[in-house]
């Protein structure tokens, strides 16, 4: 394997100034997500979701909806992820849009989506 210690990217596209931030962080998040979609990034709605049940677990999931202050992703309640969230609902996540030199981090308590919303989503998925 080649030496990776020297790998480093200089980020120069745009600085983020605290004084320029909107009062509602969802305004900026939705703007950035829209720009990632318009830039045709691969899976711009993908984010790393971390759960913790005494030790951390992280995996990539897909954002499926935004209704501030809620971000929606779906999982099988019986999956490892679903079981971890049921036991300990605090989660953290990070969207990374490298080509745009942006990331968005968040943390909060995960809870099940309303049944109707969940049923509608799962009914829309293709059968395999």
Spans of model-derived segments:
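Binding-site signature for planar aromatic cofactors or substrates
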Residues: 1-128
